[in-house]
């Protein structure tokens, strides 16, 4: 399992996010805090590879086709026939830093 140090935990405020490219994972990730819980997912839409962003109206969305994804589980919310979820990344907080893992 590959482990990467990403940022200090205090860099992310509640209802805020940031994105970063992780070369070792060949993926852009989005890290966000919602209801004081950290989430880490792929920031690349599984539909056609469009950019994913965070909307503090309780979903993630793709700019290209308007797909909305659940913050908690990454499932598509507005196209029930679209079954592919956003990829999750495991993470841990250690000595005030967020580390993510590739499964």
Place the predicted regions along the sequence by residue:
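N-terminal pre-ligand scaffold of iron-sulfur
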Residues: 1-55, 70-71, 87-103
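Short cysteine/histidine-rich metal-coordination sites, predominantly Zn2+-binding motifs
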Residues: 59-66, 76-84
């Amino acid at each position: 399992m590959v482990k990467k140090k990403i940022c200090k935990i205090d860099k992310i405020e509640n209802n805020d996010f940031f994105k970063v490219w992780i070369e070792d994972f060949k993926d852009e990730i989005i890290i966000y805090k919602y209801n004081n819980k950290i989430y880490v997912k792929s920031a690349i839409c599984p539909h056609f590879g469009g950019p994913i962003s965070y909307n503090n109206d309780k979903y993630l969305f793709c700019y290209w086709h308007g797909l909305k994804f659940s913050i908690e589980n990454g499932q598509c919310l507005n196209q029930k026939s679209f079954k592919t979820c956003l990829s999750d990344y495991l993470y841990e907080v250690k000595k005030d830093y967020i580390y993510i893992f590739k499964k």
